[in-house]
Amino acid sequence: MESSLYDEFGNYVGPEIESDRDSDDEVEDEDLQDKHLEENGSDGEQGPGGSNGWITTINDVEMENQIVLPEDKKYYPTAEEVYGEDVETLVMDEDEQPLEQPIIKPVRDIRFEVGVKDQATYVSTQFLIGLMSNPALVRNVALVGHLQHGKTVFMDMLVEQTHHMSTFNAKNEKHMKYTDTRVDEQERNISIKAVPMSLVLEDSRSKSYLCNIMDTPGHVNFSDEMTASLRLADGAVLIVDAAEGVMVNTERAIRHAIQDHLPIVVVINKVDRLITELKLPPRDAYYKLRHTIEVINNHISAASTTAGDLPLIDPAAGNVCFASGTAGWSFTLQSFAKMYAKLHGVAMDVDKFASRLWGDVYYHSDTRVFKRSPPVGGGERAFVQFILEPLYKIYSQVIGEHKKSVETTLAELGVTLSNSAYKLNVRPLLRLACSSVFGSASGFTDMLVKHIPSPREAAARKVDHSYTGTKDSPIYESMVECDPSGPLMVNVTKLYPKSDTSVFDVFGRVYSGRLQTGQSVRVLGEGYSPEDEEDMTIKEVTKLWIYQARYRIPVSSAPPGSWVLIEGVDASIMKTATLCNASYDEDVYIFRALQFNTLPVVKTATEPLNPSELPKMVEGLRKISKSYPLAITKVEESGEHTILGTGELYLDSIMKDLRELYSEVEVKVADPVVSFCETVVESSSMKCFAETPNKKNKITMIAEPLDRGLAEDIENGVVSIDWNRKQLGDFFRTKYDWDLLAARSIWAFGPDKQGPNILLDDTLPTEVDRNLMMAVKDSIVQGFQWGAREGPLCDEPIRNVKFKIVDARIAPEPLHRGSGQMIPTARRVAYSAFLMATPRLMEPVYYVEIQTPIDCVTAIYTVLSRRRGHVTSDVPQPGTPAYIVKAFLPVIESFGFETDLRYHTQGQAFCLSVFDHWAIVPGDPLDKAIQLRPLEPAPIQHLAREFMVKTRRRKGMSEDVSGNKFFDEAMMVELAQQTGDLHLQMI
């Protein structure tokens, strides 16, 4: 490098080179071009008469050699060139999406259901939809009963008779369980969700009826699904295992159906267990069946005392069906009589013949008449002779005899099977033979048609029971008439998740009007009333289906009396809802919330493993609350999220859904605990008073225990606060021996209209101004109900307490007696009266039913005694070698009980537990002398203190109840003077 060409800093200072000259020429050319444009006008257009020769030269010659940078090259046509000038195109940057939202969302299809696109049926979809429009040809029923009594398999039999499919796998001899649509239901071998199907069934005259049937779970933990199903049904089909008889959930289903004013028909299922398992002779099988029916009737009679007289079940009346879902057959006495008439070709009065096939009726073959007395030399009852003996013959010969004898027996019954059929295994052959002999379930359909009312016939009773509005409204009249042209009213009780679990479809029953796709409806929640319309949204119905368990039939409208699955309205629905026309101007009232026959007393706290995923878990908990009718999810003051359920299996199912379906996050679960209640066992030791903050008002109150059984009557709806004073007075005076003045001075139940606490105005008109008391009544009631909802011991509900207002000083000026003054004061005085009445904790207690062999009974006693449980009865199960042990067990002691029980009985005992009642926990929760030692079991008398302290800790409260919080200063002075009071230690 020559040093003369560069300066000391390395900059070139030599002669001009060629490349610099070129760049200078380009700059000059640009300047000339700009100058030329300015001469031709500011907008770049050629001036009049101006020459364009120079520009043409530049474009034609020099632009061909111009270097174009890669980013300036035009590889593709513009959007305007492709789509035209009339189309607006937008280019969006990926940065405009939030970070948590992927640019391309993956298709979210969670496999939690077993489904098919469509299923061929023996009748067309148009025929099924046509039947929906005729309420007289529709029957809405729910299959209810105990666990493993065959409800789902019985449903399989009906599905097989209406669809081009087989629900029985002949290779592995397992049933499809068509209505167990969830994968975990198939794995656990129990039903978890209630699932509907609409089947077209023929009666014995080949007339078709649309039977909307809801298959419900039999496990007592999932009885909330049964409650939701019975609300939509016009009748209950009670499925009972012939061998096991009436069990705990059978009893509860009977009671629940009667409380809902639903007629009951019975299917005695698994009759073949009497033949193949118990090996009972036909006569003993009859005794067993008769005993089962008698027990059912006893329960119906016992439950009918509060709901009015209901017809008892009787096979001769046609409301009992005998069946075996596993073998695929069913019959009633009437259908069996018709089979005899057809087989022998004899003209007879089928109903009279059927009425003689049950009870102590004998057939005298010599005179060919039926009599109450047995023939000379003895004989079997008609049911045994004409029904059980042929049934036993079919079973015994198919299972154990030679092919020839089976052929002969079936030929006598008018059935011929192919040679290939006889090569089948025993179970498939038995199914084929029985289904050929007994035919379709026409007897079952006859029973539904005769004993279950149609939607129109049942409408008045259903609406009276579930609708909260008055009877003199046009809506009520339309619902009673099932008027398709009336105002729309739909009761929603179930929500089913879509395949991606992001939203839900809602399932309900149309009572009046016609629900159509594209229709705008008002969605009224459980908190809606014409006075308070906050819980109301307007949504558009986007799709409607007939829900068929594993597939759906799309429809454009749903007439009154039909069950329908609805898309697009679920956003604001939590449990149940009422749908009505968005344009309807009259006052609309809602359908009542579901009244469950059990309580969610088991709770557990949850939190995400990764704290940043808390919003996902909270959203998942919201969906859990939608999916499970009885599940309660709430946030404690400490910030922990708790889930309340009916038992361990219920919570296990919830947690599985939360982790895998609704939140898809890892969730940590705390040890399960139980809900408690707070109560008193004595009257308040002194009159407790509290002054309002402005010192202008003073309320004096005492607390005392309620009469035994009264809390249960209030909760079960036997007595209602909505009754007039005369009705209330008569009820309390006759049943609980209250004086008329006290009975008519009841102000409220708490913490709600069916709460197990009572507030009475026990003031004297001569001492207290009645007008002023009435002016502040609502505020005092609100304070009482607030206090009853969260008691002073550990923020648990108060139960079984009667609060009496014995004195009050109310300011005459409305300004000084506002709700802000009265509500907190009423709550505080209720707490102080409660604390002075010897407070106690109450814990929930399970009723436990255990099936066991007799040699395991002793071990069961031992296991129960370790957990503070006690046996109430142990009796043999009639006709079986098993024993039924009935016991009570505190819920807090029940965790792990089933595992413990099976361990000590080598897996031979099986138990089911369901909430039964509340019991007082031993010990005084306010006894500070009790020292709780970590990692040591507390003595029985220390349990109340232990439960209270640990519950308060878990909720983030101080360990002890503070007297300063609930007692006024003047009250504290008065308390200090009563030095003999046992609870001074609390101050």
Curated annotation (Swiss-Prot):
SMART domains noted in UniProt: EFG_C (SM00838), EFG_IV (SM00889)
NCBIfam families: small_GTP (TIGR00231)
Tissue: Expressed in flower buds, open flowers and siliques. Expressed at low levels in rosettes leaves, cauline leaves and stems.
Organism field: Arabidopsis thaliana
Organism superkingdom: Eukaryota
Main location: nucleus
Region of interest called G5, as start-end residue ranges on this chain: 395-397
Primary gene name: CLO
One MF annotation (Gene Ontology) recorded for this entry: GTP binding
Protein name: 110 kDa U5 small nuclear ribonucleoprotein component CLO
Disruption phenotype: Gametophytic lethality due to female gametophyte defect, when homozygous.
